[in-house]
From Swiss-Prot:
Signal peptide: 1-21
Any one GO cellular component localisation term in the record: extracellular region
Domain remark text: This S-layer protein is composed of two distinct structural domains: a larger mass trypsin-resistant N-terminal, containing the binding region for extracellular matrix proteins, and a smaller C-terminal domain with intermediate resistance to trypsin.
Record's protein name: S-layer protein
Protein encoded by which gene: vapA
Subcellular location: Secreted, Cell wall, S-layer
Subunit structure: Monomer. Forms oligomers at high protein or low salt concentrations.
Taxonomy of the source species: Bacteria, Pseudomonadati, Pseudomonadota, Gammaproteobacteria, Aeromonadales
Source organism of the structure: Aeromonas salmonicida
Keywords: Cell wall, S-layer, Secreted, Signal, Virulence
Length: 502
């Protein structure tokens, strides 16, 4: 008898214990839509943000929802709920109209679809009337980060089924979220059921509802490339009488639903544009003579443009094919420089009311080089007494001479039959000295390193790759056993990399 009593008591206690199941939130896969917003959005604008993704909360156990308890939604990240907009979302608009922002489903063996009918919603939540419309009883607390939806006083009797569901139509919660301008990262929600100082359905986090990041982004597939020919005094290009064209140059509004006024976005092309064809007003033109949108600066060292007219909607990419074009005329008289052109797009905060200042930059929209000869030599540190003699025999270089570029790689200390990793110290930096037409230049490794700001460790092997703007040149390297020991080297398969090794 005693044993039977204990068993019966255990059954009673077990049946009274809360389920403590997790809320099941859907969707929770790659169909989830995160609303991307620009972190530079001004605060008065970002105060009123709308999520695009609707959520379904599934309470999988009978008893997850308790009489006079709450369904609790809490913001994770930098954000708050807006009281007036939440109230509007949780109201039905007029008397007995169905609710649209929040739907319910008791899931009685699959016999019900999600419903906003007043009688169905009332089975889940407490409802009050202001004489015009009905509103689900709710409270916002915890500094605006927590929203509590008040469950009905008899929800345990009316919703006595597993897998009861509440659908949150967040896309109808217009401007219900106040996000923080300047913040980076994501904002999500947790959802759970709370009663009597305990969670009866443990809260679970959603995927990010919001992501704050860039406003727009520049992109391209391939830079526009050309080589100025030394045989033509760098006045003409290896591509002939044709446009230099970048491939797939574009700008993308990376937000989900924010609009950008295109005439507020300014573009800047940085690099010497003196050699490119222009009209009488300084506007750069293509081979056909049509303006491509860039206007050269007075000093010729840059060009500017306005993105265009109209608006660019969220998620839209605009092709910028015209801006990705340059042209050197057949009768050009200005030597084309060796230069990498960078482009910047920016929007000023004082030019419009939605965004603070923002910019995005793209390196190497155009890459212009000059042809010439390449050679390399290996030296042991800056203690080397080597002398490098470079001569031009073309006699056709422009007045400013041919530039000399150097790339320096230093190798880690290693003994014979050992190995040492290479570290690139500088890449294709121009020396301050140029090669005169029909003239010569004499260089010391230590002076070369100092000229380009490189520090080579004494006694370490270093490879110096020279690119000289002459198509007819001679090089001689005087190797000496001074304080450092220099190495004569030959490398198999270097023909595509250098013309010769000394």
């Amino acid at each position: 008898m005693f044993k039977k009593t204990l068993i019966a008591a255990a059954i009673v206690v077990g049946s009274a214990a809360p389920a403590f199941a997790d809320v099941v939130i859907s969707p929770n896969d790659n169909t989830f839509v995160t609303t991307s917003l620009a972190s530079v959005t001004k605060q008065p604008v970002l105060d009123f943000s709308t999520a695009q993704q609707n959520l379904t909360l599934n309470f999988s156990e009978v008893g997850d929802l308790k009489n006079n308890g709450f369904i609790v939604l809490e913001i994770q990240g930098e954000g708050q709920f807006n009281d007036a907009e939440i109230r509007q979302w949780l109201s039905n608009g007029f008397w007995r109209r169905p609710f649209t922002g929040l739907l319910v489903n008791p899931n009685d063996h699959g016999n019900f679809a999600n419903s906003g009918e007043v009688n169905d919603v009332r089975k889940f939540f407490k409802i009050i009337s202001d004489g015009t419309q009905l509103t689900i009883v709710h409270t916002i607390d915890s500094n605006g980060k927590r929203l509590r939806l008040a469950l009905a006083s008899d929800v345990e009797e009316t919703i006595n089924f597993a897998d009861a569901e509440v659908e949150l139509k967040l896309n109808l919660a217009n401007q219900a979220f106040k996000l923080t301008s300047g913040s980076q990262g994501t904002v999500a929600l947790t959802a759970g059921a709370l009663w009597n100082a305990s969670y009866t359905a443990d809260p679970v986090a959603t995927k990010p509802l919001f992501k704050l990041g860039k406003l727009f982004q520049l992109s391209l597939t391939n830079a526009g490339k050309a080589t100025a020919l030394v045989s033509e005094g760098f006045l003409k290009l290896n591509i002939g009488d044709a446009n230099i064209s970048a491939t797939d140059f574009a700008i993308t509004n990376v937000t989900t639903n924010q609009t950008i006024q295109r005439d507020k976005v300014n573009l800047t092309l940085t690099g010497d544009v003196s050699a490119f064809k222009k009209d009488a007003n300084g506007n750069l033109v293509n081979k056909a003579g049509a303006s491509i949108g860039w206007k050269a600066a007075a000093d010729g060292q840059s060009a500017t443009a306005v993105l265009g007219a109209g608006n660019m909607a969220g998620g839209v990419q605009n092709a910028l094919a015209a801006f990705g074009t340059l042209y050197v005329a057949a009768d050009n008289t200005v030597p084309v420089p060796a230069v990498n052109f960078n482009v910047k797009a920016e929007i000023q905060g004082d030019s419009q009311a939605t965004y603070n200042y923002f910019k995005d930059e793209l390196a190497d929209l155009f890459i212009l080089t000059r042809d010439g000869m390449k050679f390399d030599t290996i030296t042991t540190g800056t203690t080397s007494a080597n002398l490098i003699h470079i001569r031009d025999v073309s006699n056709i270089l422009p007045t400013e001479g041919g530039k000399i570029f150097v790339t320096i790689t230093e190798y880690a200390d290693h003994a014979a039959n050992g190995r040492g990793e290479g570290t690139v110290l500088v890449t294709r930096k121009a020396l301050s000295v140029t090669l005169p037409s029909g003239g010569a230049v004499t260089l010391k490794p230590a002076d070369v390193a100092a000229d380009v700001g490189a520090s080579i460790t004494a006694g370490r092997q270093a490879r110096l790759v020279f690119e000289v703007e002459t198509n007819q040149g001679e090089v001689a390297v005087k190797k000496s056993n001074a304080e450092g020991v220099d190495i004569q080297n030959g490398t198999r398969g270097t023909a595509p990399l250098v013309d010769f090794t000394l």
